[in-house]
Amino acid sequence: MINKTLLQKRFNVAAVSYDQYANVQKKMAHSLLSTLDRRYSANSSIRILELGCGTGYVTEQLSNLFPKAHITAIDFAESMIAVAKTRQNVKNVMFYCEDIERLQLEETYDVIISNATFQWLNDLKQVIRNLFHHLSIDGILLFSTFGQETFQELHTSFQRAKEEKNIQNETSIGQRFYSKNQLRHICEVETGDVHVSETCYIERFTEVREFLHSIRKVGATNSNEESYCQSPSLFRAMLRIYERDFTGNEGIMATYHALFMHITKEGKR
């Protein structure tokens, strides 16, 4: 289970540094936005709900792409919303500080979009059902999240360190994510046309600590309530193995496995 209080605190702290370190999240955002750009014309007066708007990177792009749209942007970290409101072009946006899993929607939307957020939900299936209910006919629910191969180098190095030290417990170094098939199954809804795609981004860093620092700066450190690594000696072993086994000519590598889901609400024409 995700500890929402801890997660909220971390995102509030990370608000000032998020954009500087969110390289992969921005790439994922552009993939989502290109789908909308192909689907709707610039003068469309569509209703858009953005969930997990963060610092407003996607929000501003939506406003630029669809200046006549009515955009509602939601995040549960007040500091993130404060940063988002400072962006130059968010004039057609209403911001609200809410938890997605407690959201009480009263309207329907042509587009519901979320970038790199749904991995933080404890009951994704229920959220999908709720959001689908608030899509207009032919509306689209479009989101990205992280898949199971994300940080595979980190998890592999940690497991090898545990084996080296003969540690048998269930401690982990980070959150585990859905596979492509698991996500597809979760997102199956009645009268919905479901499509899922995936891609992997490889980021390079000079050392493992730099990589871990970048994760902290976007607020994405482990927020699970279950056991996690607290042993300094195990952590040092993990760092050593990571740099030994996953260093190339351009530095150490870190995999980000991105899953892209879009669900169209079908109806009678």
From Swiss-Prot:
Reactions that this protein is recorded to catalyse: malonyl-[ACP] + S-adenosyl-L-methionine = malonyl-[ACP] methyl ester + S-adenosyl-L-homocysteine
Listed EC numbers: 2.1.1.197
Single Gene Ontology BP annotation: methylation
Domain of life: Bacteria
Keywords, in A-Z order: Biotin biosynthesis, Methyltransferase, S-adenosyl-L-methionine, Transferase
One GO MF term: carboxyl-O-methyltransferase activity
Keyword S-adenosyl-L-methionine (UniProt): yes
InterPro entries reported in the protein's UniProt record: BioC, Methyltranfer_dom, SAM-dependent_MTases_sf
Pfam families assigned to the protein according to its UniProt record, in alphabetical order: Methyltransf_31
Pathway noted in the entry: Cofactor biosynthesis; biotin biosynthesis
Family: Belongs to the methyltransferase superfamily.
UniProt-listed NCBIfam families: BioC
Protein role: Converts the free carboxyl group of a malonyl-thioester to its methyl ester by transfer of a methyl group from S-adenosyl-L-methionine (SAM). It allows to synthesize pimeloyl-ACP via the fatty acid synthetic pathway.
Protein name: Malonyl-[acyl-carrier protein] O-methyltransferase
Annotated source species: Bacillus anthracis
Taxon lineage: Bacteria, Bacillati, Bacillota, Bacilli, Bacillales
